[in-house]
C-alpha cells in the first residue's frame, strides 16, 4: 500500500475512545473533574448478569465477574475509566503487569464489517484477548500490544438509550 492509499484509508477510520484502567474509579473520576474539568461521568457496572457474554482469550467466562466503567466526553472523543473488581478480565491482568494508566484506544467499526476486520487482524497473527456484548454494543480487544505497544479495541460504538436504573452519574446533580 502506498502513502496515498494509506492516507485515503485512514481518512475513513474513526478513533472513538481512549481508555485508562484504575484501582479506584471514584477517586479517578474526582481527580479528572477537579484537575481537568472533565465530566460528568456516566457510571456503569458490568457483570456476568449484565453482559450477554464475555470471552477472555477465546474462552467464555463462566465464573462471576464485575468491572465498573465511567464514560465522559471531550468533543466527539469518548473517555473511559475502568476499574476491575473481580473475575477474569484483561483489565486486571493489565494492572498486574503495568499498573494503572492508559489501557487502549478504540476504533469504531460498522456492524456489517466487524467480523471481516477482526478476521483480517487474525490473519496477521493478531488475536482477540477479550470480547463481549452489552445491549447492542460489542467490543473486541486485539492482542496488538506486543507489536505496537498499546491495545487496540474494535467496536460498533452505538449510542445506547439506557434506563436510569442501569447507570449513575458522577458527580451527582446534588453534589
Spans of features found by a protein language model:
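Mid-sequence acidic-hydrophobic segments that form the walls
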Residues: 88, 108, 112, 120, ...
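Short helix/turn-capping signatures at newly exposed starts of structured segments
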Residues: 12-17, 34, 80
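Residues within well-ordered alpha-helices
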Residues: 28-29, 68, 117
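Conserved active-site tyrosine of GNAT-family acetyltransferases
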Residues: 31-33, 121
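Vicinal oxygen chelate
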Residues: 2-10, 16-21, 39, 43-80, 84-113, 115-175, ...
Amino acid at each position: 500500500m502506498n502513502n496515498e492509499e494509506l492516507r485515503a484509508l485512514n481518512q475513513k477510520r474513526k478513533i472513538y475512545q481512549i481508555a485508562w484502567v484504575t484501582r479506584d474509579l471514584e477517586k479517578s473520576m474526582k481527580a479528572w473533574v477537579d484537575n481537568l474539568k472533565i465530566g460528568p461521568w456516566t457510571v456503569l457496572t458490568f457483570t456476568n448478569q449484565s453482559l450477554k457474554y464475555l470471552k477472555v482469550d477465546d474462552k467464555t467466562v463462566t465464573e462471576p465477574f464485575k468491572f465498573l466503567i465511567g464514560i465522559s466526553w471531550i468533543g466527539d472523543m469518548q473517555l473511559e475509566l475502568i476499574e476491575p473488581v473481580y473475575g477474569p478480565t484483561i483489565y486486571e491482568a493489565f494492572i498486574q503487569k503495568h499498573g494503572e494508566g492508559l489501557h487502549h484506544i478504540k476504533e469504531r467499526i460498522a456492524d456489517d464489517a466487524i467480523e471481516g476486520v477482526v478476521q483480517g487482524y487474525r490473519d496477521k497473527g493478531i488475536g482477540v484477548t477479550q470480547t463481549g456484548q452489552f445491549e447492542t454494543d460489542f467490543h473486541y480487544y486485539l492482542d496488538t500490544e506486543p507489536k505496537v505497544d498499546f491495545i487496540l479495541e474494535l467496536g460498533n460504538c452505538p449510542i445506547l438509550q439506557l434506563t436510569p436504573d442501569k447507570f449513575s452519574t458522577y458527580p451527582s446533580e446534588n453534589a
